[in-house]
Swiss-Prot record:
Residues reported to bind L-kynurenine: 83, 97, 373, 408
Primary location: mitochondrion
Biological function: Catalyzes the hydroxylation of L-kynurenine (L-Kyn) to form 3-hydroxy-L-kynurenine (L-3OHKyn). Required for synthesis of quinolinic acid.
Subcellular location, record wording: Mitochondrion outer membrane
The gene coding this protein: BNA4
Superkingdom assignment: Eukaryota
GO-annotated cellular components: mitochondrial outer membrane; mitochondrion; peroxisome
UniProt record similarity statement: Belongs to the aromatic-ring hydroxylase family. KMO subfamily.
Any Pfam family the entry gives: FAD_binding_3
This enzyme's EC code(s): 1.14.13.9
Organism: Saccharomyces cerevisiae (strain ATCC 204508 / S288c) (Baker's yeast)
Any Gene Ontology biological process: anthranilate metabolic process
Protein name: Kynurenine 3-monooxygenase
Substrates-to-products reaction catalysed: L-kynurenine + NADPH + O2 + H(+) = 3-hydroxy-L-kynurenine + NADP(+) + H2O
Length: 460
């Protein structure tokens, strides 16, 4: 008889985990406290969704689980070969991601989530929406899951499973129940930032330029870096762009005291968007849409001994979105877990234990990198010194091949290099670049001093 598993959370990682385990013959039930997002009656489906950038780690994970489904699911993604930096005068500068035409890919979160749910409908997975996890009783036999169901989520309901997988996000109920069973180290950190979803509608005005109903180049991730705040935009397949404003809590609270203040702020700081974004709609969104917080979560261990439960995705390692790796990392979690189960011939206890032991260093690394990258996106991309270092980084990579790989390439385009290994290699490379930078500046200073002395002697 096949083992039964309850997967808590029908977001992106939960759906992929359900697909992976159903492919391996497990009896899978996927739960979510929300209603089915594919239904027209489901409210507030995408008011707080930062568009996704899926790259090598996420794509490779999808391919490893179901190559045919991967091709279908990702058919609407739009390749982005670099960042497009917009300055205060409306000028644009392209900064390519890769050395050989590599690209990350824009895809709408809701479209991807719904596509995964559609794939699950074709499998043996049972989908149960409107089920809120309340409690788990841990036993040596079955894990007893208590839910609250119904429209008001107040009717009690109980099911038993061989094991549980928590994919229920940063505020994971599964993790809370695991903390009652195991001694779990846990940390939660909020960044002093909030984000608001904005929208750039499709238009036919620039169709000759971009080959579609896009107002700006779809093959770039657009960034309006303003040091203490920024705006980004990623293309959707219908020609629209999902745009997101990031700013401090105090700044946003001060702005939204009046519509006129928001309007003036947008016109002053993002002058080139007023021709492509409905300004009235943007002001309305600033005032009425959720001002969502950004939280980082780290914990360890990720499992309950005996193979009773494991955490994947944001439930284990919520991160800020500035490296575009949250979903990619969560998908990679699933791929690595399935590989470990195969390695241990389905022995959950051994596979889950090894997952915690080997994965933790990588997850801490990418969570930290994501935090660091906000400064790069909002400030460094306008720095000549930063851009010079990036060019040197690329030059050394061309000369030295695989012996020198830029950090972004290792993270976004090389799923064969772990996050922790990428961070370690990049640290060594950065130290070399800084040394060469200091050496060059020192030589220029000495040269300048000698030239000055020579010229002053000539005059005397």
């Amino acid at each position: 008889m096949s083992e039964s598993v309850a997967i808590i959370g029908a977001g992106l990682v939960g759906c992929l985990a359900a697909l992976a385990f159903s492919k391996e013959g497990y009896n899978v039930t996927l739960y979510d406290f929300r209603q089915d997002p594919r239904l027209d009656t489901t409210k507030n489906k995408n008011l707080k969704s930062i568009n996704l950038a899926i790259s090598a780690r996420g794509i490779d994970a999808l391919k490893s689980i179901d190559p045919d489904a991967c091709e279908h699911i990702l058919q609407d993604m739009i390749p982005m070969k670099g960042r497009m930096i917009h300055d205060l005068k409306g000028r644009q500068e392209s900064q390519l991601y890769g050395l050989h035409g590599e690209a990350i890919n824009s895809i709408n979160r809701s479209v991807l989530n719904n596509s995964l749910l559609d794939e699950l409908e074709k499998s043996t997975t049972e989908l149960k929406f409107g089920h809120k996890l309340v409690k788990i009783e841990w036993t040596d036999d079955k894990q007893i899951c208590h839910f609250a169901i119904g429209e008001d989520l107040k009717t009690p309901h109980t099911e038993k499973y061989d094991f549980v997988i928590g994919c229920d996000g940063a505020y994971s109920a599964t993790r809370s129940q695991m903390q009652r069973k195991v001694e779990m180290d846990f940390s939660q950190e909020y960044m002093n930032l909030r984000y608001i979803e904005l929208y750039i509608p499709p238009t036919e005005e620039f169709k000759p330029n971009y080959g579609g109903n896009f107002a700006i180049a779809p093959d770039h991730l657009h960034i309006w870096p303003r040091h203490k705040f920024m705006l980004i935009a990623l293309a959707n397949s219908d020609g629209s762009f999902t745009s997101t404003f990031f700013g401090s809590k105090d700044q946003i609270s001060d702005l939204i005291t009046s519509k006129s203040r928001v309007r003036e702020f947008l016109i002053e700081n993002f002058p080139d968007i007023i021709n492509i974004m409905d300004l009235d709609d943007a002001v309305k969104r600033f005032i009425t849409y959720p001002k969502e917080s950004l939280v980082c979560v780290n914990c360890k261990p990720y499992d309950v001994p005996g193979g009773k439960a494991i955490l994947l995705g944001d439930a284990a390692h919520a991160m800020v979105p500035f490296y575009g790796q949250g979903m990619n990392c969560g998908f990679e979690d699933v791929r690595i877990l399935m590989a470990l189960l195969k390695k241990h011939s389905g022995d959950r206890s051994r596979a889950f234990t090894e997952y915690t032991q080997t994965r933790h260093k990588d997850l801490v690394s990418i969570t930290e990198l994501a935090k660091r990258n906000y400064k790069e996106m909002s400030h460094d991309v306008t720095s000549k010194r930063f851009l010079l270092r990036k060019k040197l980084d690329a030059l050394f990579s061309i000369i030295m091949k695989d012996k020198w790989i830029p950090l972004y390439t290792m993270i976004s385009f090389r799923s064969d290099i772990s996050y922790s290994r990428a961070l370690e290699r990049a640290g060594k490379q950065t130290r070399i670049l800084k040394f060469l930078e200091s050496l060059t500046l020192g030589m220029l200073s000495i040269g300048g001093y000698k030239l000055f002395k020579f010229l002053t002697r000539e005059r005397s």
